[in-house]
A protein has these predicted regions:
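Conserved ankyrin/ankyrin-like repeat signature
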Residues: 52, 84-85, 117-118, 150-151, ...
Length: 197
């Protein structure tokens, strides 16, 4: 047992002796000085602790709890490509499209770090395909800028808009071209042609 925890527990015992009242836990109040670390769904997901995420939610942990960046467990599971945690969070009632401080959803972030399977799972369970972040960027624009053809194709298959533009006026093709990803440009143009025919 570490010194901080020992001191805390000793303090509870001393308070009981001084006041004659039982410790707060015995009265139904759960005091845990380490709760910010151990009982935070977002942090457990960030650290890829699937068992901890499951346990926290099963014991009443809020699945959409946010950290200082406004990110939830779903954001971190998407970034990490942790399909198990995504599934646990979905089962626990977590939102699919929460926005963090910059307006990014889990789908934005999964696309940004090339987590193909996380993108596909989020799309399959009904994540919004075209949300804008604070810069007006959609997951398709982000995937296009990263050059990930597989993610671009997955987004297009779910109906991602190729005509939406961000605050600079660039669309997904513009981002792919500027980032020198000709394969992405071709994939988007093929999808546009297929829609027209």
């Amino acid at each position: 047992m570490n010194a901080r925890r020992t001191a805390f527990l000793g303090g509870l015992a001393l308070a009981t002796v001084i006041t004659g009242s039982p410790a707060p836990r015995a009265q139904g109040i759960q005091i845990n000085p380490f709760s910010q670390y151990y009982e935070n769904v977002a942090r457990a997901a960030k650290q890829n602790q699937a068992g901890q995420v499951r346990s926290l939610i099963a014991n009443g942990g809020y699945p959409d709890q946010t950290d200082d960046e406004g990110r939830t467990g779903m954001h971190y599971a998407a970034i990490n490509g942790n399909l198990q945690i995504i599934a646990i969070l979905i089962k626990g009632g977590a939102k699919l499209d929460p926005k963090e401080k910059l307006g990014n959803t889990p789908l934005h972030l999964a696309a940004d770090v090339n987590q193909v399977e996380a993108v596909k799972l989020l799309l399959d369970v009904g994540a919004a395909v075209d949300p804008d972040n604070k810069n007006g960027m959609t997951p398709l624009m982000i995937a296009a800028s990263r050059g990930n053809v597989e993610i671009v194709q997955a987004l297009l298959a779910k109906g991602a808009s190729v005509t939406k533009t961000d605050y600079t006026g660039r669309d997904a093709v513009g981002w792919a071209a500027e980032s020198r990803h000709p394969a992405v440009v071709q994939a988007i143009k093929r999808a546009q042609s297929a829609k027209k025919s």
